[in-house]
Structures are given as structure tokens and as C-alpha cells.
């Protein structure tokens, strides 16, 4: 991985880092077990893993890619997209706790960004926390031509266009350089869920997924045993 979850995480942050990040820039190397984003140097928020294996906040990597011609801010590898949800990291953050560096309150890492938004000591020292790229990209719904934030498109389609079967182009694919905005007939919602929903942990119960995987392995083992028994 290439946030501070990477073993080579001692590189400095880009100029867009937050005030607190600028203060930390002299640190020799952040630990491998840290859950800090290598762009803003705050605790990861909605972590995303890029194709080159690095992990960043979703808003940080989105802004960085648009400002740096679609290259990884850490290793400069070309990235065709923001990446995929780092669900393993998000899951670990829900069970890890850390004291706020300013007020010393013990906070779950998954809630740390929400905490420092209201932490008066943090605000007094650095000002209100500003996420990179807080203004979401805009797109047009291909069914009704309504202008929406990209984050709102999926919910909008599920609410208003679930029964639509007209072939349409994906408006989010059009925002990505070199991406082919394929035409979808009756499956745009599924495409958005698979390709453009970065926070599966908001919609999926990890325990259910783990149980399903265990059942699948057991079923496969039983099937192999039966096949071997029949063969003999």
C-alpha cells in the first residue's frame, strides 16, 4: 500500500496538505501500522486503494488525480481511476481506537474525521477541517437530464429510474480520461454499484459476506469430496 500503510511511507506530502500536515512534514517516517493518508496526513477518511496498491482518502486521491494528470501522488504511476474501496482498511479502522492528538479523547479511527471536525482544540489550533475536493464533480442523469453531484447519481437512479430500460451512457465514465462510456440497457444501476460505488461498507454487512464465503468454501469442499467418491 502507498499511504502510510506502505512500508516506504516516508515521502513528504504535496503542497495541498492541511495545516497539521505541514507541521508534521519533518517527521522522518510514519509507522507501517498508521492509518494516516499520505496526501493530507490526517486519519484516512473513506479509504480507497489505487491500482498501484497505495491507500488514500477518497477526496484526496480524487483531487490529486485531477490536479496531477492522473498519476499517483506517491509513486507517480499512471492511474486510470481513483481505485477501489479499501474495505479491509475500513473494517480495521472500525475496531481500532486512538487518542485525539489535540484533546486526548479516545476515538474510533473510523470516526476520527468526524471528531476533529468538532474538536474545539483542533479548530482553535488549525481552523475548521477542510477536505480536499469537497465540491463534488457534477454530472447529468442520462434518463431525466437532471444535474447532480456524482455521489448522488446512484441514489437518484434507484429512487426515480429503477424500472428504466432505455440504453444510456454512463455519465461518470465520461468524467474519467481514456474511459469508454459504454451504453447500458437496463443495467446502469448495477454498473454504478459495481464500478462507481466506493464505500461498500455502507451497504454490506461484513459478517454476512464472511459467512457466505465460508459456506461457499464448505460447499465446494463437499462437492469435491462427492466427485472423488463417485470416481472411485
UniProtKB/Swiss-Prot annotation:
GO terms for cellular component: Golgi membrane; intracellular membrane-bounded organelle; VCP-NPL4-UFD1 AAA ATPase complex. It is a lipid-anchor. Residues 1-27 are annotated as: Disordered. Keywords: Adaptive immunity, Golgi apparatus, Immunity, Lipoprotein, Membrane, Metal-binding, Myristate, Transferase, Ubl conjugation, Ubl conjugation pathway, Zinc, Zinc-finger. Residues 43-45 are annotated as: Interaction with the C2HC RNF-type zinc finger. It comes from the Eukaryota. A lipid is attached at residue 2 (N-myristoyl glycine). Interacts with UBE2D1. Interacts with VCP/p97; leading to recruit RNF125 to RIGI and promote ubiquitination of RIGI. This is E3 ubiquitin-protein ligase RNF125. It comes from Macaca fascicularis. The lineage of its organism: Eukaryota, Metazoa, Chordata, Craniata, Vertebrata.
Amino acid at each position: 500500500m502507498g499511504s502510510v500503510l506502505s512500508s516506504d511511507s516516508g515521502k513528504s506530502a504535496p503542497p495541498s496538505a492541511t495545516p497539521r500536515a505541514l507541521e508534521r512534514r519533518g517527521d522522518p517516517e510514519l509507522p507501517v501500522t498508521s492509518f494516516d493518508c499520505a496526501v493530507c496526513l490526517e486519519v484516512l477518511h473513506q479509504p480507497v486503494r489505487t491500482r498501484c496498491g497505495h491507500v488514500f482518502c477518497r477526496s484526496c486521491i480524487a483531487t490529486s488525480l485531477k490536479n496531477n494528470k492522473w498519476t499517483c501522488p506517491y509513486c507517480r504511476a499512471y492511474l486510470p481511476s481513483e481505485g477501489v474501496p479499501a474495505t479491509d482498511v475500513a473494517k480495521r479502522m472500525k475496531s481500532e481506537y486512538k487518542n485525539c492528538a489535540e484533546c486526548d479523547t479516545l476515538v474510533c479511527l473510523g470516526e476520527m474525521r468526524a471528531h476533529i471536525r468538532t474538536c474545539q482544540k483542533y479548530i482553535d489550533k488549525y481552523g475548521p477541517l477542510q477536505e480536499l475536493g469537497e465540491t463534488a464533480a457534477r454530472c447529468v442523469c442520462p434518463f431525466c437530464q437532471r444535474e447532480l453531484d456524482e455521489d448522488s447519481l446512484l441514489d437518484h437512479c434507484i429512487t426515480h429510474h429503477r424500472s428504466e430500460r432505455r440504453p444510456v451512457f454512463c455519465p461518470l465514465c465520461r468524467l474519467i480520461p481514456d474511459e469508454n462510456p459504454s451504453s447500458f440497457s437496463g443495467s446502469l444501476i448495477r454498473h454504478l454499484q459495481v464500478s462507481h460505488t466506493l464505500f461498500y461498507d455502507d451497504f454490506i454487512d461484513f459478517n454476512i459476506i464472511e459467512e457466505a464465503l465460508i459456506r461457499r468454501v464448505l460447499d465446494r469442499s463437499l462437492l469435491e469430496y462427492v466427485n472423488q467418491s463417485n470416481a472411485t
